[in-house]
Amino acid sequence: RALRAEAEQALAELDAEISQAKARGQETAYAEIYPYLAQVAFHSRLAAFWQDRAAEQRQALSLLLAGAREAKRELVAVAQGKAAARVVPPLPDYGKLEIRDGYFRSGADPALIFAMLYNDHSALQRWFANSETGYEGALVAGGDRFNVERQPIWQAYQQYPDTHRVGWDNASALIRDEGSWEVIGPPVIICLESPHTLDAIAKMIEQFEREHAGDRSHLVQNMDFEYAYVCYCERTRQMWARWLERKYADVRKANAIWATTFEGFSSVPMPRPEQAGKNRALWFDWASFNLNRFVNHIKWTGEQVRRWEPRKPLTVGSPYYAFDPAFWTGIDAEELTDSGVTGVVLEENYALDTLMPEYLHALAGHQPVEDFEYHGVLHQILPSFLHGDAAISMWWWNSAMHWTPNEPINEWTTSFPQSYTIPLSDLAKAMRDALDVRRLGREIAALGSAPRPIALLYSKSCMLQQPPKESAEIGTFPYLSSLRGIYNASQAAGLYVGLTTEKKILSGDLAQRKILVLPGAEFVPGPVRDAILDWVDGGGTLIVSPDSLLADEYARPSDTLGKLGLKMVRREPAPLKHGETVVTEYNADELPRMAFTTNGVRLEAVGARQVLECAKTEVSGRFQDGVPAVVRQGRGRGQLYWLAATLEPASWRQFLSMVARQAGLEPELQVTAEAGSTAEYVEYRVTELQGRHLAYLYNNSDREAHLILKTAFAHRGMLDLRSLAPVEGGRLLVPARETAIVEFQ
């Protein structure tokens, strides 16, 4: 009772100070967070039966007490001229924003959008943007799981058997199966190849576009997301045969690649996922075909929309599948982005890192990347903007509880005001971050759009070459695990690290890169391999992580090792203890470390190991048993580093930094930790904006980081742009899971 009375008194005093500040014309948005949270804490929060309600209440009251007092102190300090005011611009009018150079813009300035889902007209817009950035309809399918009975596709599905999917009973949002969330009804799993399906979809699109004609209050028209598609109908078989004929022209050429004896393309079967491992060359073509035919349907959908709506930017996608073994069933984000259908790149990130926004940023070109339903962790919202996102709507903030069929009861644990798992401090952080994203849009966009001189290869061939059934249980496979692991380990190296693709490499993307990393990219097409090696000869630096470049896209052995003068004597598997097939972050700690030294730096590797033979002069480091750990070759004006085993994260950061220095990439900012602290998990980058140097520092750990910043450029002082407090003596405290943005003056 005493704590509640104290908190209520502090909130009352803050309310009075807010009123006075408003009368002075002072910004009060940050201070208003705590009175609003008090209403949430007292009227909306749920508690699980196993929780200590008294302890939960004390925690909430303590937060409100401390927050209210600090907010009052800040208002008073600003009024007395002792602190700078953090002035937040108004929320943008979506009808007046333009798309230009990867962002939604008001004039020249980027308008970054941080919204909470399902809040389009509420008091929450004091802090968060309107989450209705787009108007949405399941146009690709002609309906969704909620409204299918009211759409033309329903009648077609009842009347024409060829509208029914064949050989695949998972709707994946096209349209409804027995496991569909929040709805009860008979399965409606459509075939997109049927003319009756296409006719019904076209009618639905016409109706939808007529209803939304003249819309000027949204940024984009969303043709929906979370789509995946597979069908084994007769029309698909005919499409498959025609696709193969266009690709190969002569079936003998295809037979030579597949090691088969088909008499014609019409006799080539449609492989099932469980058969993928039996003929991986044939599977690669089938998986490629499935991606292609789905993108073609998306293009057709876009053409139908453009009959009625010629201008509104469109978006659609299933980016989740870009990092999933089921990639072959989804929408190919690269081909979709290059197709001209979309004006905004759609994102939906579930992962606990920034790999997806970084990948989509690499594909987007001048299109903004917008996450329409962010399911990641709160502390990576701001880093996601710093990796290229232009807009994010976070899941979710519902103002009233309700229940619908097939909805898991624990879904309410993810709604911010009701959740008993999301602490009240996270609500306060989200509200502060939303204000800072709006206030610092120019600086965040500059940091997020800076050039990436280092790139990791996102290999579509590797994604398609994984037999789905082999990786379905754990949701990953060696290439995908290596890509994510190396990407995350690279973040604390102080260097801009992006992604490139096989298609982009063939289009000359490496001309803007200094370093390319192959993260276990085993299956790489020959022309891509050759383009990479030519780039190295011209002065590039290549890091090859095992088991890259061992085969082509059809899983046929590659001659890369021979071309490089290397020989693999054998491959020693990782000593996994529980029957696993992949080394991941979850089992790596159980494995022995393999130490070696290169260029005076002691490093450790983990997992499988390649035993290589090469010229002695090319060995840059050896394991303790004398086996080469790193091979370094000079090729023309460039350098190639071949790692015989995967480095553990801290060693990878050291190795990447060492290679970067040798390639002429010296970080402009050095970040070290004060005694008793660590900078090991601090991600940081530096860029320039209109003559100013800017940096962000993201502390991706559960401990506060006491940092020392040293620059390679001259400056008079440093300013923490989030707090508007000076960084004295280059010493900066970054709390756990927080991000600082610093201006060097």
Question: Where are each of the predicted segments found?
Answer:
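Mature N-terminal, pre-catalytic/accessory segment of carbohydrate-active enzymes
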Residues: 1-142, 188, 199-206, 214-215, ...
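Hydrophobic targeting/anchoring helices
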Residues: 71-84, 179-185, 309, 315-485, ...
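Short acidic, Pro/Gly- and aromatic-enriched capping/linker segments at domain boundaries
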Residues: 79-104, 234-243, 615-631, 723-727, ...
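Catalytic domains of carbohydrate-active enzymes, especially glycoside hydrolases
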Residues: 115-154, 339-344, 380-391, 489, ...
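A short, well-structured beta->alpha microelement
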Residues: 118-124, 322-325, 489-509
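Aromatic-lined substrate-binding rim segments of carbohydrate-active enzymes
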Residues: 122-188, 205-208, 301-308
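Polysaccharide-binding and catalytic clefts of secreted carbohydrate-active enzymes
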Residues: 178-351
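A conserved amphipathic helix/loop scaffold
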Residues: 519-745
